[in-house]
Every structure is written in C-alpha cells, then in structure tokens.
Amino acid sequence: MVHLSTAQLIGYHVLTQRPPGHDSEAFFQQLSPEALYNHVFQQIDALRFFPQNIRYFLNLPVKVLINDDALLLKLCSSSSNITIKLQDPDIFYTLSTRQLSRLYKRIQQLEASGLPLWLDDFDEKMFATFSNKNWRLCGIKFDKKTFWHLVSELQKLRQAIFIGHKIATDVLMEGIETTEQRGIAFYAGATMEKDYLWPALLPDIY
C-alpha cells in the first residue's frame, strides 16, 4: 500500500499462498467459521516475526466478525499495526437489520480499540447504500475494475472518490498501472494505491 502524494510505503496486504491452479476464493468460501478464525490468527501470529514499524492489512469475512465473540475480543487486543479489511462488503445486502446493527457496533468497538477497519473491493453500486447509512470507517478500497471503468471519465471518478470520503478517511485505488493514471487518481482525491506501478518489495523477516 502506497501513499499517493508522497509515494511512501504505508503497509502490506497479507495474502495466503495457495498451490498453482487452485481457486483461492473457492477455498476460503468452503472453510468453516472456526477455520477462518484460526486462519486469521495464524496470520497475526506470523506477523510477529516481521518488521513492526509498518501496517499489515488482513482480510476478514463480514459474517465471521458478526458471529464470533472470541475473535472480537482477540482482535481488540491485537497489535496496533494491523488493519482489518472486510473482504466481502457485498454481503451487506443479505444482512438483516439486527445483523447490520451488530456489525456496525463491532466496527465501532474495533476502531475504538485502535484497530482500523476498511471495506475491500468497494464499487459504484455500494455508494448510496453505505453513504445513506452514515457509516464511517478508516478506509475503503476501490477495486481495479471500478478504477479502470472510471479513469477515462474524470468527473465520475471525482464524484466516486468524493462519496468515498463521506464514508472513510482514506480512499485507496487498486489498478494504477501508469504515472498518468497515478496523477489522475491523485488529483481526483484518492489518498492511497496498491499494486502494479510500484514493485512488490517484501519486508525482511527478523
């Protein structure tokens, strides 16, 4: 993750390496809530051996956050250099009013404990839903397809990022591949970027 105005490295997106040819999304979809819980904390434990002066962004399914009380408590006591990305915000549309209220309360609890929450793969169809709910988070990430769709229509891109800032402090664009696109994203109001234009530099393990 890179800051657009300074090109300063902000942090790393923590991913799970699967064997070649394996569908990662299908793998995680079939995992039980308990297995997902264990996976998240295996990642957190592994990060203790990496530099601590940088942020690490971890994916977390929305329903795991809603339903697992033990996970909430453990996250609240986790390292201050971790950011949680809710990886499936589209599931928002399937939640009941009670589940939405529970999710919002848990987001507030985590952020109050110093653990930032982001929405992953935000797209145009989510604008009205999230802004009308008056939810406020630390960050949102627009997926690369949304950026590529909007990059040639500057006014629409600016409007999308403006709405993004109503929901979150930081707006990250995925899919910037050229310095021209970087400039467009920056002047349209985005604050951060991941992948493509910058080399994938891995942190040294202690």
Q: What do the predicted segments below correspond to?
A:
Residues 37, 41, 100-104, 154-158:
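Short, well-ordered alpha-helical scaffold segments within catalytic/effector domains
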Residues 44-51, 67-83, 101-108, 112, ...:
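Acidic (Asp/Glu)-rich catalytic clusters
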Residues 31-35, 95-102, 149-152:
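Alpha-helix N-cap and loop-to-helix initiation/capping positions
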Residues 55-72, 111, 116-141:
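N-terminal-biased segments
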Residues 56, 82-84, 117, 171:
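Hydrophobic/aromatic residues located in beta-strands of well-ordered beta-sheets
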Residues 1-78:
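Bacterial c-di-GMP phosphodiesterase EAL domain
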Residues 1-9, 16-20, 87-96, 120-125, ...:
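EAL-family c-di-GMP phosphodiesterase catalytic domain
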Residues 78, 89, 107-115, 120, ...:
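Conserved anion-binding
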